[in-house]
Amino acid sequence: GKGSAVNLATLRGKIAMAVNVIAIVSILLVGPVLGVLDHTPARLELQVSPTVELQSYHGKTQKYTIPIDDITEVQVYSSLPEAGRIHGLDLEHYWQGSFVMVHDGTVHLCLDPTAGKFLRVETEDGIFWFTGETDEKTEKIAEWIIEEMGQTAD
């Protein structure tokens, strides 16, 4: 093709070729990793010993831990408001990191954006959005937290 020749006899040509090879190999390695991340479900767990905490995981990696005593409000939504990523991942089936939402401002997400139920947890430190492995699990965890807090469901 036009302009695709590289003179490998020069240092500049060798460096250009090395950069291209590294870029191609990196793409081949990163693609499958992102595919695995996208299809690994986010999950929620309640840790009850020694203190009660809501823990958010992606695969085996713990992403967020929130003591129940720090939670000021819990709500379950059936749709996710529009969000713009500040930093983190926004794959087709997994969002994690800091995002901006219209009414909440900066929030922290660890969820599957294609889920049917979303758990919104508000603390003094910020707002967090999660999903469990299933919609039923998300709702059950919300009910348990509300009972634990002594808060009435809306």
Model-identified regions with their sequence ranges:
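Membrane-proximal soluble regions of multi-pass membrane proteins
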Residues: G1-L8
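Alpha-helical transmembrane spans
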Residues: L8-R43
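Non-transmembrane, membrane-adjacent beta-strand/coil modules in membrane-associated proteins
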Residues: Y57-P67, T72-D125
